[in-house]
Every structure is written in structure tokens, then in C-alpha cells.
UniProtKB/Swiss-Prot annotation:
Lineage per the UniProt record: Bacteria, Thermotogati, Thermotogota, Thermotogae, Thermotogales
Function: One of the essential components for the initiation of protein synthesis. Stabilizes the binding of IF-2 and IF-3 on the 30S subunit to which N-formylmethionyl-tRNA(fMet) subsequently binds. Helps modulate mRNA selection, yielding the 30S pre-initiation complex (PIC). Upon addition of the 50S ribosomal subunit IF-1, IF-2 and IF-3 are released leaving the mature 70S translation initiation complex.
Domain of life: Bacteria
PANTHER family (UniProt xref): TRANSLATION INITIATION FACTOR IF-1, CHLOROPLASTIC (PTHR33370:SF1)
Key words, A-Z: Cytoplasm, Initiation factor, Protein biosynthesis, RNA-binding, rRNA-binding
Protein name in UniProt: Translation initiation factor IF-1
The protein's assembly and partners: Component of the 30S ribosomal translation pre-initiation complex which assembles on the 30S ribosome in the order IF-2 and IF-3, IF-1 and N-formylmethionyl-tRNA(fMet); mRNA recruitment can occur at any time during PIC assembly.
NCBIfam families, per database record: infA
Length: 74
């Protein structure tokens, strides 16, 4: 189980929708990562489309993959 200290939250924009609720997200610093939807977003049927601004959680162990935890209001 990971600690709160091991998680980095960053903002980004969805670039591409991929199969199985995966998305390619471009972070504010220009890096592109692969991210999946968190369980609460999936449970509440929150739809994401390319161009949406999102908050992504990254672990310090793998900075190429993340979890989308929040969709910003546009």
C-alpha cells in the first residue's frame, strides 16, 4: 500500500482516448503519460473526452503511468 508521500498530483490535458478507459495525457511540463480512470470516476459515470483538463496522480516509482482523479470544469 502506498503512502501519501509517494504520490505526485499534476494537471494535464487529455490528448487521446484509448481502449479500456485508458487515456494519453499531456502534463503541464510537456511530458505525455498513459493514465486510467480512478474507480470513483468510473462508478459515477464521469465521461472524459480529448481536450478535458484533468488532475493526475503519479507515483514516484513510475512516472510514465498515472491515475486520473478529477476532471476540471471547463
Amino acid at each position: 500500500m502506498s503512502n501519501k508521500e509517494d504520490i505526485i498530483k499534476m494537471e494535464g490535458t487529455i490528448v487521446e482516448a484509448l481502449p479500456n478507459a485508458m487515456f494519453r495525457v499531456e502534463l503541464e511540463n510537456g511530458h505525455k503519460i498513459l493514465a486510467h480512470i480512478s474507480g470513483k470516476m468510473r462508478k459515477n459515470f464521469i465521461r472524459l473526452v480529448p481536450g478535458d483538463k484533468v488532475v493526475v496522480e503519479l507515483t514516484i516509482y513510475d512516472l510514465t503511468k498515472g491515475r486520473i482523479v478529477y476532471r476540471k470544469k471547463s
